[in-house]
Curated annotation (Swiss-Prot):
Biased composition (Acidic residues): 48-73
Intracellular or extracellular location(s): Nucleus; Nucleus, Nucleolus; Chromosome; Nucleus, Nucleoplasm
Keywords: Chromosome, Nucleus, Phosphoprotein, Repeat, Ribosome biogenesis, Transcription, Transcription regulation, WD repeat
Induction line: Increased expression upon activation of the Insulin/TOR/Myc pathway in response to protein diet.
Protein source organism: Drosophila melanogaster (Fruit fly)
PTM section of the record: Phosphorylated in response to nutrient-activated TORC1 signaling.
Name listed for the protein in its UniProt record: Periodic tryptophan protein 1 homolog
Effect of gene knockout: Larval mutants exhibit altered cell transcription with reduced levels of Pol I-dependent rRNA biogenesis and, to a certain extent, of III-dependent transcription leading to reduced growth. Displays delayed pupation kinetics and reduced pupal volume. Exhibits reduced number of germline cells leading to fertility defects; female flies have limited fertility, whereas male flies are sterile. In male larvae, germ cells can enter differentiation but spermatogenic cysts cannot develop normally.
Described function: Chromatin-associated factor that regulates transcription. Regulates Pol I-mediated rRNA biogenesis and, probably, Pol III-mediated transcription. Regulates the localization to the nucleolus of Cdk7, a regulator of the Pol I-elongation factor TFIIH. Acts as a regulator of cell proliferation and tissue growth as part of the TORC1 and Myc signaling pathway in response to nutrients. Required in males for both germline stem cell (GSC) maintenance and early stages of germ cell differentiation of germ cell cysts.
Organs and tissues of expression: Detected in the germline of adult testis and ovary (at protein level). Detected in ovary somatic cells, in zfh1-positive cyst cells in the testis and absent in differentiated cyst cells (at protein level).
Entry similarity comment: Belongs to the WD repeat PWP1 family.
Pfam families: WD40
PTM annotation (Phosphoserine): residues: 385
Cellular-component GO terms for this entry: chromosome; nucleolus; nucleoplasm; nucleus
Amino acid sequence: MAEEGPPEPSIDFVPALCFVPRGVAKDRPDKIVLTQAELARIIGDTQQELDEESDDDAEEGENAEEDQNDMDVDDHADANSENRDPQDEFQFQEYDNEANANVTSLANIVDAGEQIPDEDEDSEAEDEVIKPSDNLILVGHVQDDAASMEVWVFNQEEEALYTHHDFLLPSFPLCIEWMNHDAGSEKAGNMCAIGCMDPIITVWDLDIQDAIEPTFKLGSKGSRKQNKEQYGHKDAVLDLSWNTNFEHILASGSVDQTVILWDMDEGQPHTTITAFGKQIQSLEFHPQEAQSILTGCADGYVRLFDCRDAEGVNSSSIEWKVDGEVEKVLWHPTQTDYFIVGTNDGTLHYADKRSPGQLLWSVKAHNEEISGVCFNNQKPNLLTSTSTEGTLKVWNFDGTEAKHVYEHEFNMGRLQCMRQCPEDPYTLAFGGEKPPRCAIFNIKNSIAVRRTFGIPDAE
């Protein structure tokens, strides 16, 4: 009888990924050697946070038990339904309830000494060196109850793709945003913000290879026991957008039905937008107008806010209504009055910010929800879309219609995300739920794409 190997993970997929531009990463990321005191502090802080959450959860449970006596059974069921995470297709409520396991994992890793670099290691190994021609790809990976960020190296010229290093995350990642703003430093950084099932946004320095805690966090759950005030989001963070014009500002959208504009230099919310009927699933700052942010909500509304007046921002929006839930919104990078909207029924809508409430065209692009959209800054009439049905499609569009050009089936199960290489808009990265789970694809490989958009054949 053949020996049985380890069981296959029941959950294994890539829910989020992000490109890092070439030339911004250190050629050799710093490796941190922790002292025993620093190690004890990190483990102690983590354990304290979990103890505080456990105490608060217990107190909330006692209060809920008292309140239950005053409720109808039907009302109680409705409340549970409302509190259930709408993104929880893989039952990650159970994953969050197992948070205590992460502390044990953290302690074991540190005790094993695997985070401490050996002086005898060959630091000149080629794969360790990040070249100016390399892109990094930040890959959020979920495997059963473990969540991690994998930092991949992608070199287009050499056709190389490999994992450089990874680090543990405190919760299941939902969105990743790269930014070069290093809070507290006058120099440009190499940072990323991660939104998770947990309401706290973590910000990591990508030039530090062995980090076991983020550089800083945005938000606090608060603690009655420690008399700590709650601030920031109260539920999962579904999307992030960095303001490239005001580089200290990061926007986040949440299941708690708010958008927060964070001042990263202060580590505090600057503006909170509450004009939503359901969770915010997508948002993006305008590429040129720093005060404008576009949001997509599960209530079927796309809203454009002027954020210059923090007090009046909730009444400043203009709106577009579509059928279904808004899954994606994206500004056109060169024709910046226009934007695309993707919904949970697989429809794409194109609109002009100067025409509130009007849609220029709509097309039933996919049979399932839109999980990614990308414009092309070299070909302004080229649009790509992906869906959880597992396909990539390429569209040729103008102000009146979109025509299907090409499609590709990845056989990776449900495609969860798609992002575009900053230096080559034809090269796209995808995250899915079946091997290889992360894939790179260049749409110029398609003859139909080259012919339609006048792209020369490769030599």
